[in-house]
Amino acid sequence: MIRIDATPYPYQFHPRSTALVVIDMQRDFIEEGGFGSALGNDVRPLAAIVPTVAALLQLAREAGMLVVHTRESHLPDLSDCPRSKRLRGNPTLGIGDVGPMGRILVQGEPGNQILPQLAPVEGELVIDKPGKGAFYATDLHAQLQERRITHLLVAGVTTEVCVQTSMREANDRGYECLVIEDACASYFPDFHRITLEMLTAQGGIVGWRTPLAQLQAGVAAYTGENP
């Protein structure tokens, strides 16, 4: 077992029963000129974590973990997007409308693609999710159960919305979740900090948190003991 120094207490897992879930590292959310910046958000906090997420992906791949990527996306006819969701945010630029990188949050559009430097490789799962949580209206739970996954490492954007929602969904389904705190981000840094505190309050009510460096140290120690 790999032991990681974490909050609120050490987290333990085995690579064979663990998946890395990278949430919504999409061009429209992270790049200048995308949907996120068109709504008036400062995308720099999200762009800043890209190297950390890339390093996390490398670690997971080298350790032999399952890697899962999610994209918040909808069918071109928006049949999986309720009216209540379409009306949220800036009413002049909504889901399905043509934005700077094609139709917003629609499958197959340029802005809906995962950043090239974080692109999935052969054998990794890509989950197109119509909601904020990675488990809602997807087959993610079935895919994880089929592979006997019990533990999840979680990263991505935004911390307070899709990352938190996915962790809570996973917790309700029995997964032990560790969020990599410097591999997540929000347009609002205070939201990021407070969400991490919420997830790990009361003895880890939803899960654990740790920086990438602690994860790397734990994996390196395990590898040294099990060459």
Curated annotation (Swiss-Prot):
Enzyme Commission (EC) number: 3.5.1.-
Effect noted on mutating residue 162 to S: Loss of activity
Lyase as UniProt keyword: no
Pfam families reported in the protein's UniProt record: Isochorismatase
GO BP term (any one): amide catabolic process
PANTHER family (UniProt xref): FAMILY HYDROLASE, PUTATIVE (AFU_ORTHOLOGUE AFUA_2G08700)-RELATED, PEROXYUREIDOACRYLATE/UREIDOACRYLATE AMIDOHYDROLASE-RELATED
Function recorded in the entry: Involved in the degradation of triuret (carbonyldiurea), an impurity in agricultural urea fertilizer, and an intermediate of uric acid oxidation endogenously found in human urine and in prokaryotic metabolism. Catalyzes the hydrolysis of triuret to 1-carboxybiuret and ammonia. The product, carboxybiuret, channels into biuret metabolism and is spontaneously decarboxylated to biuret. Extremely specific for triuret with four, three and two orders of magnitude less activity with biuret, 1-nitrobiuret and formylurea, respectively.
Protein name, entry field: Triuret hydrolase TrtA
UniProt organism field: Herbaspirillum sp. (strain BH-1)
Originating gene: trtA
